[in-house]
Amino acid sequence: QNTSDVASQPAHDALMARYGSEGNGDTDSADVDLAAALAAADRAELADTIASAGLYNQKSKTLIRLAERVVAEYGSAAAFDSFVTEEDPAAVRSTLLDMKGVGPKTADCVLLFSGGQAGVFPVDTHVHRIYRRLGVAPPDADHEGVREVLEREVPAAKCGFAHTASIQFGREYCTARKPACLEGPEACPLYDLCDRVGVDEETSEVVDPAEATVDD
């Protein structure tokens, strides 16, 4: 959570190499349980393993705490995976949000990518900014408000692609302080579809959509 893909992927790969089946070469991979391995992990060693993700001391504590809960309540990572994929999505989301260290975006990503719940649209800072700036969601909508709009308007089968594409669009075009539209209509592929809420092209002033003055 709160880590870019560029930083999180190497950390994930290192974690799996040390604590997953790759890091347990003497053991049948079917017998390796990631939750049990993380629950028993040395915190300093785990922190060093995921250092590329940033905030590694805090995240290592969170991972161990979550792994301990999974083992205590479900018995194994596999059993928890079954819970995520087979139980009612609302119940799964509620359970995830009850876990300290898991926020709405992380919970929704688990539902979408691990649980196979196609109609879930995770909202990170990019998604929250883009769809209010576009005028798709109300300018004062919080993360949950934006999620509700997107899950209502976007076809379920497209939510996963739209989520990842939106993040890329936010990084390349619809940035927080200097969106591409300030360079002119040709600079942004969605220029003609966007209300540009909070963006003043004449002064180049950019504010959060919630702070923008909307003309009647």
Language model feature labels by segment:
Residues 1-215:
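Catalytic cores of DNA base-excision repair glycosylases
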